Amino acid sequence: MWQLLLPTALLLLVSAGMRTEDLPKAVVFLEPQWYSVLEKDSVTLKCQGAYSPEDNSTQWFHNENLISSQASSYFIDAATVNDSGEYRCQTNLSTLSDPVQLEVHIGWLLLQAPRWVFKEEDPIHLRCHSWKNTALHKVTYLQNGKDRKYFHHNSDFHIPKATLKDSGSYFCRGLVGSKNVSSETVNITITQGLAVSTISSFSPPGYQVSFCLVMVLLFAVDTGLYFSVKTNI
């Protein structure tokens, strides 16, 4: 039994080896969630991926250029325009992530959102962000040139359930001291049908299946060895 089991087990162990197509794709997250920021803002990019016990390093890429940082989080302390671009990450047991775009703007105000395309009934979260978080008051959010929401003190604007009527061009304005400032205009689109995916789910089925198969086969080999030795005794 043992003589037959060992070659079969070894063959299956080799076939259970990880292939590139079996590896999960790494995912990049932004903290805070805004992918449009102002100069001097701090941004943290986090890489979610699978690691082996021997190697927990992370490869980061900015505009396809390798970044020296090997930590799972990449921290930008004071963003500049040069930090704009595509960011990707990869671990030794994950393939290269999809790109995440970071946009660094110059100005007093920036209208921020986690994305610009939503589906009907999605919640929409808008933020009128000031440079270096300077105090801002008498803030107005405008849609298609018309006042949509007013706050005496700066506050985020929430739309609980989006409708097709919420599509359009948006910007915000307010007072910094006595200076009247406005953000650039952005376009928000509301779609019908399936939800717009913003964060890829992370699930490494290929790795888990292969690992479980290896463990089962190792158990089978040990069991076969035990009975073989017992029979010989």
From Swiss-Prot:
- What modifications follow translation? Glycosylated. Glycosylation plays an inhibitory role in the interaction with IgG3.
**Ig-like C2-type domain: from which residue to which, for each copy?**
40-96, 121-179
In the record, the effect of S203 to T/Y/A/D/K is given as:
Has no effect on membrane anchoring via glycosylphosphatidylinositol
According to its UniProt record, where is this protein located?
Cell membrane; Secreted
The alphabetical list of record keywords is: Cell membrane, Disulfide bond, Glycoprotein, GPI-anchor, IgG-binding protein, Immunoglobulin domain, Lipoprotein, Membrane, Receptor, Repeat, Secreted, Signal
- Which top-level group of life is the source organism from? Eukaryota
What function is annotated for this protein?
A: Receptor for the Fc region of immunoglobulins gamma. Low affinity receptor. Binds complexed or aggregated IgG and also monomeric IgG. Contrary to III-A, is not capable to mediate antibody-dependent cytotoxicity and phagocytosis. May serve as a trap for immune complexes in the peripheral circulation which does not activate neutrophils.
> Known PANTHER family for this protein?
IMMUNOGLOBULIN FC RECEPTOR, LOW AFFINITY IMMUNOGLOBULIN GAMMA FC REGION RECEPTOR III-A-RELATED
The protein in question is named Low affinity immunoglobulin gamma Fc region receptor III-B
Q: What is the lineage of its organism?
A: Eukaryota, Metazoa, Chordata, Craniata, Vertebrata
